């Protein structure tokens, strides 16, 4: 049974069309990073991220009620809604000149919650598949090498601990996705990988490279991630009977 919304809900083509536009805007933002003033770029990037997250949350909420309360839509709506709130708080603090206090902070819990809730949506929407335990262990070890190295170099602090949590949650999301046939759904798979990459780079930027402007490319990557994820949920998977 496709995970699209039935005829009485939001037309699938409208939802996917909106997020194809967001994806195109994300691509356009990449070269804009070299042209626009850093503050202008940051504002444009964050407004688009907020818009994509908020519209995604609304689309998933309506889809939840219009599709017989399928649970994966609720998990996805929660993920996008919490992320939008967290990013709004992040940008307000940066706008007020409080960039130094946004990492680590409670705001990070919203970004991490996105990964937890998205993993929950995958568990409901996608059929479970067997993954070689060595692959899962390899992913975990590979992704935790960097934060562990940071622990060894800088010690255990609030910042290094938060960095570890970002990498751990990213590894967990990828492993859970792979164990629920995520590779068979290229839009969802690509969106998930982009989000994980963005939010492994994010703590590294905050801890090690706060002055490097080109790392603001995280913004377009997140917009692309959201776009692919929404398109994937409305086009690709077949929900489990229990959903």
Residue ranges and their predicted role:
Residues 2-243:
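Polytopic alpha-helical membrane-helix bundles and their juxtamembrane interface segments
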């Amino acid at each position: 049974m496709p995970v699209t919304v039935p005829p009485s809900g939001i037309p699938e083509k409208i939802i996917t069309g909106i997020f194809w536009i967001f994806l195109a805007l994300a691509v356009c933002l990449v070269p804009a990073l070299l042209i626009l003033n850093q503050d202008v770029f940051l504002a444009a990037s964050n407004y688009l991220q907020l818009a994509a997250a908020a519209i995604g949350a609304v689309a998933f909420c309506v889809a939840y009620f219009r599709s017989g309360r399928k649970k994966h839509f609720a998990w996805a709506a929660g993920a996008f809604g919490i992320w939008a709130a967290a990013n709004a708080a992040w940008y307000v603090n940066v706008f007020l000149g409080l960039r130094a206090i946004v990492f680590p902070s409670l705001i990070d819990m919203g970004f991490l919650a996105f990964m937890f809730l998205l993993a929950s949506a995958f568990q409901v929407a996608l059929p479970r598949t067997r993954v070689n335990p060595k692959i899962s262990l390899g992913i975990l070890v590979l992704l935790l090498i960097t934060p562990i190295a940071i622990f060894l170099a800088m010690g255990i602090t609030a910042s290094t601990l938060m960095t570890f949590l970002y990498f751990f949650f990213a590894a967990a999301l990828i492993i859970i996705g792979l164990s629920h046939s995520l590779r068979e759904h290229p839009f969802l798979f690509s969106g998930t990988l982009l989000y994980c990459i963005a939010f492994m780079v994010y703590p590294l930027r905050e801890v090690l490279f706060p002055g490097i402007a080109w790392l603001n490319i995280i913004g377009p990557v997140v917009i692309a991630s959201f776009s692919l994820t929404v398109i994937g949920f409305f086009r690709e998977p077949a929900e489990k009977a229990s959903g």
